[in-house]
Amino acid sequence: MTGLEEDQEFDFDFLFEFNQSDEGAAAAGATAERYSYATTGISSALPLPTAPPTLPAPCHDQQASAAGISAVGSAGHPAGYAGAVDGGPSGYFLPSGGVRPNGAPALESPRIEITSYLGLHHNNGQFFHDVAVEDVLPNPRRSPSTATLSLPNLEAYRDPSCLSPASSLSSRSCNSEASSYESSFSYPYASPQTSPWQSPCVSPKTTDPEEGFPRGLGACSLLGSPRHSPSTSPRTSVTEESWLGARTSRPSSPCNKRKYGLNGRQLFCSPHASPTPSPHSSPRVSVTDDTWLGNTTQYTSSAIVAAINALSTDSSLDLGDGVPVKARKTALDHSPSLALKVEPAAEDLGATPPTSDFPPEEFPPFQHIRKGAFCDQYLSVPQHPYPWARPRSPTPYASPSLPALDWQLPSHSGPYELRIEVQPKSHHRAHYETEGSRGAVKASAGGHPSVQLHGYVESEPLTLQLFIGTADDRLLRPHAFYQVHRITGKTVSTTSHEAVLSNTKVLEIPLLPENNMRAIIDCAGILKLRNSDIELRKGETDIGRKNTRVRLVFRVHIPQPNGRTLSLQVASNPIECSQRSAQELPLVEKQSAASCPVLGGKRMVLTGHNFLQDSKVVFVEKAPDGHHIWEMEAKTDGDLCKPNSLVVEIPPFRNQRITSPVQVNFYVCNGKRKRSQYQHFTYLPANAPVIKTEPSDDYEPALTCGPVSQGLNPLTKPCYGPPLALPPDPSSCLVAGFPPCPQRSAVMSPPPSASPKLHDLSCAPYSKGMAGPGHLGLQRPAGGVLGGQEAPRPGGPHPGAPQLHPLNLSQSIVTRLTEPQP
């Protein structure tokens, strides 16, 4: 413990002329400094009392009522920072009342000063601050005069309201409102008044010794490292790492943030926070000078500091995190002073836990920390997530999530079908945002488009949603450059409401049961957005001038009994919104054929607009990734070409051996960049069976069917039809005692492309004219065996069957039955 006095490594006495009579007092003060501890959190902007009082705040054990700006000295000591022992010029300091024209405090010249400090009276390990300073500090131990090296007074050198680069690397001003609270939590040993050895750097002057005690700010130095770094420290204010973190062996720089100028006047505080925030978050709550209205005392101890260091990883002690900026009161009332009190540990002598306004269960990890009137100056913000007091519905309705607008939905499902009864016109001039409306979308034959929902029998009305979608070869989605526009007026008969879903305007139209769920769309126009506004969006790749076709997309949501929602969607034909494109680009509205065999050669008539004599029709097959696999130009008949119609010969497909239909596209081209939208076309396989339709006089009967039951005579009856294959199901044939087969076998069914005349010889249509075995003039005897000598059937032959005499028919049946079975 005596190494402090014996170590002369950083003794600067040989550099400066000190009074040798004060060396003893300086040594005694250094001894007392090791047992002194200055508290934090005390603002230096307290009101200044005029009378020289004593130290009224009590201290327990090693606790002292001192501010971050610590000044050692007595009120009656004649020497101070205002006077220099070297006889330097005193004109560098402005008068106490001097201020600059803009209201800021007067600038004062910086200087280098070395000051020795004395400790307080130590008696049995306790400090008594409630005695007069004159009694505590005897004459031999009073603070010596300060050795001052004054520099020239440069007005533009440094503003006292700003920190110098040599003082701190912190980006906050010492007088800013945002940093006033953290400035008051500066380390005591960071002040030039409490450091045993000073850093030889230029730093602004702090409070005079004789000004510290009248303000009730006692001076103590922290029990810590005996030496300070001679270099600057990255920060002097308390942050999360320094206030709650472990104490390092090398304290911060002796330079500190101060709230008083060299002339003794209180510095002006900016009402706004510092424009450059600190790179480290700090537990500040932006307490201004007005909120510190009296002496504030903090009780600390070494045990509490050790406990805080051990729990420094807990974030629940962040004082400023729970107070948002907008939660602060705008009008500060003069309420009791703020006090952040820390209970001393149980082993502290004479420790009395102060009263607390908060129950200890609010801070379980830190029950020894008490809050005084800390939240009196701010709106009440609870520490835990705010429980909304808004009453909730006793039976909350969980609305199912509706599909997004870019989802591909069917137009019919089950008994429901959403259908466009009247298609819109192929061209509509969209209006810009800067011009008036151009009216609602019209239909081709006059009037307006209409939409109807079929299969809905409920009495509840539904909502029909309408938005503008794309009309290119990609998947249907909301159009980026066009929006729906609500049309109102005396001529509009349909009510509507405009909504926005995912940055897309949606027009909501009611579907009423009294109107058969039908709506006339006379309230929808098309609005053109500016290309520059859309093309600059993030992720937008479309170009507005090349994407001028749209579709009217209708969507309806039908609630189901099981709580689900059925969504149907249907899109209209493409609508050209550009006037120039409508006059130049070809448009296909209708095609006479939708499919053809792969051999091609079939003619197709296209109906639309802007067809020319040299218009070309190109068939294209695309890969799943969009690349063209096959392209073929079809032949057009120039003699039959008209501006609104075009005759084209379908080309053969590239693969003649396909086994399933293949869907391709085609478009009409009037030039290099004048193409129509892609139209769909389907190629069918070429090996589809084709059956001749010419009748024949001698029909070969089909193979007989085997018996179906052991109790019956194996007598069977043939089914007239083409000899295709043996039916797999024996019950499909006419058997004695059984009605005729209701349908044909799957093997014997003709292809879909066959002529409807070929069903005359089939089993199913032929059986329609039979009511039973008696239809052929055969009666069933008692034994269940057919007889061939029965009378002919009274009715005439089947209209579609060949003209066969009943007698010849029965004879052929008997002859066939007498032949041996294979």
UniProtKB/Swiss-Prot annotation:
Location within or outside the cell: Cytoplasm; Nucleus
Region Disordered: start-end pairs: 192-289, 772-822
Feature: compositional bias, Low complexity: 225-242
Residue numbers spanned by region Transactivation domain A (TAD-A): 118-210
Motif stretch (Nuclear export signal): 302-313
Motif segment (Nuclear localization signal): 257-259, 672-674
Domain RHD intervals: 400-582
CDD domains in the cross-refs: RHD-n_NFAT
Calcineurin-binding: annotated span: 110-115
InterPro entries given in the database record: Ig-like_fold, Ig_E-set, IPT_dom, NFAT, p53-like_TF_DNA-bd_sf, RHD_dimer, RHD_DNA_bind_dom, RHD_DNA_bind_dom_sf
Modified residues (Phosphoserine): S225, S229, S237, S286
First and last residues of every Sequence repeat: 195-211, 225-241, 274-290
UniProt-listed Pfam families: RHD_dimer, RHD_DNA_bind
Described purpose of this protein according to its UniProt entry: Plays a role in the inducible expression of cytokine genes in T-cells, especially in the induction of the IL-2 or IL-4 gene transcription. Also controls gene expression in embryonic cardiac cells. Could regulate not only the activation and proliferation but also the differentiation and programmed death of T-lymphocytes as well as lymphoid and non-lymphoid cells. Required for osteoclastogenesis and regulates many genes important for osteoclast differentiation and function.
Domains: entry comment: Rel Similarity Domain (RSD) allows DNA-binding and cooperative interactions with AP1 factors.
UniProt-recorded name of the protein: Nuclear factor of activated T-cells, cytoplasmic 1
Organism from which the protein derives: Sus scrofa (Pig)
Organism lineage: Eukaryota, Metazoa, Chordata, Craniata, Vertebrata
Gene that this polypeptide is encoded by: NFATC1
